[in-house]
Amino acid sequence: MFRGSIPPLPTPFRRGRLDEEALRRLVERVVQGGSHGVSVGGTTGEPGTQTLEERKRAIEVVLDQVAGRVPVIPGTGALRLEETLELTRFAKEAGAQGAMVIVPYYVKPNQEGLYRYFAEVARAVPDFPLLIYNIPGRAGVEIAPKTVGRLRRDFPNIVGLKHSSKDLEYLSHLFLEAGRDFLVFCGLESLTLPMMSLGAVGTIAATANWLPKEVALLCEKALAGDYQGARELHFYLLEANEAIFWDTNPIPLKTVLSWMGLLEKEWRPPLGPTTPEVEERLRRMAERYGLLPKEKEAA
């Protein structure tokens, strides 16, 4: 179903509005770079700063540009269940191949509350594949492996989970509860290979917006059992993977993409530009990976 590298696209803005032309450029970069899917509206896309209509339009643009070449898995989660249901239904009707639903943030629900929340979403789109998005650092709560296993048994359309945490022990318990065929994706760039060695089927890594070919190849080698080749790519990508988090994601990502001419260096409040010191580190990193146009390297 879903596997490999599925880059989470940033949302490009121009003068405060969705920059559809830039979004199409980003889609082409990752698809032509060999990515195995595309995600829009995840953490990297700043969904919490957008209206539902803006999020819907971004999904439409990405689906139109992808044109069926690879699966599109939008992030459709929101704090309010009603908004999550509306956006998930929209993604399905628009032609997406699945949706990624974040663990509700800020309110810190208990495990029964999380079960009921995801059960409502699964019931609303019974034949539509769903990935749970586990990101405790942002959500303030983690969905337990036992809760995921219960959801998987009760709702066949809950097919996988994106794990954005350094806790690798979690994965072992998750596979025991949800089954070895549960589709787990790494959500922390530098842990792609370690998670895939435990059974994850791919990564949803922001680094793939910079280096789509290399991230896709790492996943392909790991899935084929070529761990020596995958390790070489793991260490090659390490600095870029770490650079994503030199400031709050997607600030470093968008900074470098703006230098590459792919989007404007623009965020929605409360996000803002990084420090000159981080910019200089990013510039040196981007030079080492050959990401900058020649005039930028000389600047």
UniProtKB/Swiss-Prot annotation:
GO terms for cellular component: cytoplasm. Keywords: Amino-acid biosynthesis, Cytoplasm, Diaminopimelate biosynthesis, Lyase, Lysine biosynthesis, Schiff base. GO terms for molecular function: 4-hydroxy-tetrahydrodipicolinate synthase activity. The active site is at Y133 (proton donor/acceptor), K162 (schiff-base intermediate with substrate). It catalyses: L-aspartate 4-semialdehyde + pyruvate = (2S,4S)-4-hydroxy-2,3,4,5-tetrahydrodipicolinate + H2O + H(+). InterPro entries: Aldolase_TIM, DapA, DapA-like, HpaI_NOT_DapA, Schiff_base-form_aldolases_AS. It comes from the Bacteria. Catalyzes the condensation of (S)-aspartate-beta-semialdehyde [(S)-ASA] and pyruvate to 4-hydroxy-tetrahydrodipicolinate (HTPA). Belongs to the DapA family. This is 4-hydroxy-tetrahydrodipicolinate synthase. It comes from Thermus thermophilus (strain ATCC BAA-163 / DSM 7039 / HB27).
